[in-house]
Each structure stands twice: as structure tokens, then as C-alpha cells.
């Protein structure tokens, strides 16, 4: 009778984490940014049928990178949780923090169970508040941990490089056009540092807009509206570049 092959618990967990990270890295990156009037979700997604971003409840949005069937199951579970809690108690009792805790328990249980493989997903749960100070953004990696994010967050294949780019350039009070332009610039940068162009038809964009009069703040941005915002953001960026150039020129003359 042969001796069973022994793997230490630490090595087993490390192998599962590496497996999940590699699966997530194969997915396209996405970013979530705060702007003056809410939170914007931006990702490269050539499919018109499969969405990376979805509404969970009135003020809560969901974003995910990784295996579609796995994060779609989580999304559906989140919608059911939110609907049941809002119906049983009150709509105000449905929060991003509560939903993030539910997702963390699910992901953590699956990750630590040897009976099934870990989920190859990374989630973002965001809730728009009455003011930017009350916005909430939570990132949930494959192991079920919760990271409280502020300003911007990136998940997916090139998340580390994109996060560094956003941290240097994102600022409070940006307009939607400015935030969208910054997000596209960040997503356009490849791992080798080169920049490529992402056409509007390959972008998936959604917002949680605190200024909407409706109770539901989630809205997708498509078609002509998306094109106009991209053009507006480009014009704003060009104007800032010209202003900086004139300032530098004036300083040289002095």
C-alpha cells in the first residue's frame, strides 16, 4: 500500500491562491473611479451580451473580473440577498458593506474548502452616497478578504500597473468626462508600457449617479452619450496640456 502524498496546509493554500490569481489575470482589467457626482465603472468588453458591471440595488453597483459563470452566480446571489433584505426590513438597510460581507463569506468558504476549486474572480462592490465623502467602494479578492478602497480601484489582468497609474492622476472633484478619459487612458496601457487605442464600441461604461432623481442610481452609458463624453474628456485634457505649456513658457521668459 503506497503512502499518500503529503502537502502542507500552507502549500495547499498557496497553490490555490496562485491558481485563482492566474485565472483572474487572464481576464480583461476594469476600473472603478469616484467623480464629483458619483462613481463610474469602465472596462474593455467587446461583448454586448455579457456585462462586467451590473446594478445590485438602488445605490449599489457590482463589477467583476475573471470567469463569467462564477461571478454571474455571485451577482445573482447578491441581487436576491438585497431584494430579500429590502423587502423584509427596509430599503435603507441594504448597504454595500453588508453585501461585501456576504460575498466575503461565500468566497472565503469556497477558497478554504478542499472539496472544490477556488473561484477565479475578483469583485468590486460600490455604493454611491449623498456626497462623495459617503461613497463606499469595496474590493474582494478571490480569498474573501475585503479591501476598503477610496478614489479609484482596478481589478483584472493588469490591475497593479493600472492602479499605480490611477493613484498618480486621479483627484477629487473630477467631472464624469475627466474620470472617463483617465480610466480609458489607464486601461489603454499595456504591461510593456506602450499605449493602444480602445474604440468606444469596445468599452462598457456605467455610473452610479447621485444626482439622478430616481431612486435607482445605476445607469449604463452607451452610444452617442459615450462618444460625446470621450470627446469632451479629450478636449479637456488638451486644454490642460496647453495651459501647462503656456505656464512653463512664461516661467522660462522670466
From Swiss-Prot:
Gene3D superfamilies found in the cross-reference section: Glutamine Phosphoribosylpyrophosphate, subunit 1, domain 1 (3.60.20.10)
Activity control, per UniProt: The formation of the proteasomal ATPase ARC-20S proteasome complex, likely via the docking of the C-termini of ARC into the intersubunit pockets in the alpha-rings, may trigger opening of the gate for substrate entry. Interconversion between the open-gate and close-gate conformations leads to a dynamic regulation of the 20S proteasome proteolysis activity. Peptidolytic activity is completely inhibited by lactacystin, and to a lesser extent, by N-acetyl-Leu-Leu-norleucinal (Ac-LLnL) and benzoyloxycarbonyl-Leu-Leu-Leu-vinylsulfone (Z-LLL-VS) in vitro.
PROSITE patterns: PROTEASOME_ALPHA_2
Recorded superkingdom: Bacteria
Alphabetical keyword list: Cytoplasm, Proteasome
GO biological process: proteasome-mediated ubiquitin-dependent protein catabolic process
Biased composition, class Acidic residues, residue ranges: 239-254
Pathway: Protein degradation; proteasomal Pup-dependent pathway
Localisation: Cytoplasm
Gene Ontology cellular component annotations, sorted alphabetically: cytoplasm; proteasome core complex, alpha-subunit complex
A GO MF label: threonine-type endopeptidase activity
Segments for region (Disordered): 231-254
PTM entry text: The N-terminus is blocked.
Pfam families xref list: Proteasome
Temperature-dependent activity: Optimum temperature is 55 degrees Celsius.
HAMAP family from the UniProt entry: Proteasome_A_B
Self-association state and partner proteins as the record states: The 20S proteasome core is composed of 14 alpha and 14 beta subunits that assemble into four stacked heptameric rings, resulting in a barrel-shaped structure. The two inner rings, each composed of seven catalytic beta subunits, are sandwiched by two outer rings, each composed of seven alpha subunits. The catalytic chamber with the active sites is on the inside of the barrel. Has probably a gated structure, the ends of the cylinder being occluded by the N-termini of the alpha-subunits. Is likely capped by the proteasome-associated ATPase, ARC.
PANTHER family with a match to the protein in the record: PROTEASOME SUBUNIT ALPHA/BETA (PTHR11599)
Family that this chain belongs to: Belongs to the peptidase T1A family.
Protein role: Component of the proteasome core, a large protease complex with broad specificity involved in protein degradation. The S.coelicolor proteasome is able to cleave oligopeptides after hydrophobic residues, but not after basic or acidic residues, thus displaying chymotrypsin-like activity but not trypsin-like activity.
Protein name: Proteasome subunit alpha
Species of origin: Streptomyces coelicolor (strain ATCC BAA-471 / A3(2) / M145)
Lineage of source species: Bacteria, Bacillati, Actinomycetota, Actinomycetes, Kitasatosporales
Primary gene name: prcA
Amino acid at each position: 500500500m503506497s503512502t499518500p502524498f503529503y502537502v502542507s496546509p500552507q502549500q495547499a493554500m498557496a497553490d490555490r491562491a496562485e491558481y485563482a490569481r492566474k485565472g483572474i489575470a487572464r481576464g480583461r482589467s476594469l476600473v472603478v473611479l469616484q467623480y464629483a457626482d458619483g462613481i463610474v465603472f469602465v472596462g474593455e468588453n467587446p461583448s454586448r451580451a455579457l456585462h462586467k458591471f451590473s446594478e445590485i440595488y438602488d445605490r449599489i453597483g457590482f463589477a467583476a473580473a475573471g470567469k463569467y459563470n462564477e461571478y454571474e452566480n455571485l451577482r445573482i446571489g447578491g441581487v436576491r440577498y438585497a431584494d430579500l433584505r429590502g423587502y423584509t426590513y427596509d430599503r435603507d438597510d441594504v448597504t454595500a458593506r453588508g453585501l461585501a460581507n456576504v460575498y466575503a463569506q461565500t468566497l472565503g468558504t469556497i477558497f478554504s474548502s478542499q472539496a472544490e476549486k477556488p473561484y477565479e474572480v475578483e469583485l468590486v462592490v460600490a455604493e454611491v452616497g449623498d456626497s462623495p465623502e459617503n461613497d463606499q467602494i469595496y474590493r474582494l479578492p478571490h480569498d474573501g478578504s475585503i479591501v476598503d478602497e477610496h478614489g479609484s480601484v482596478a481589478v483584472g489582468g493588469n490591475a497593479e500597473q493600472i492602479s499605480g497609474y490611477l493613484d498618480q492622476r486621479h483627484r477629487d472633484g473630477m467631472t464624469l468626462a475627466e474620470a472617463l478619459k483617465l480610466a480609458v487612458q489607464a486601461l489603454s496601457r499595456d504591461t510593456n508600457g506602450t499605449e493602444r487605442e480602445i474604440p468606444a464600441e469596445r468599452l462598457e461604461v456605467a455610473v452610479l449617479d447621485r444626482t439622478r432623481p430616481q431612486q435607482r442610481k445605476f445607469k449604463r452609458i452607451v452610444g452617442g452619450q459615450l462618444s460625446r463624453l470621450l470627446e469632451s474628456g479629450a478636449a479637456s485634457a488638451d486644454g490642460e496640456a496647453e495651459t501647462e505649456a503656456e505656464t512653463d513658457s512664461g516661467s522660462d521668459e522670466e
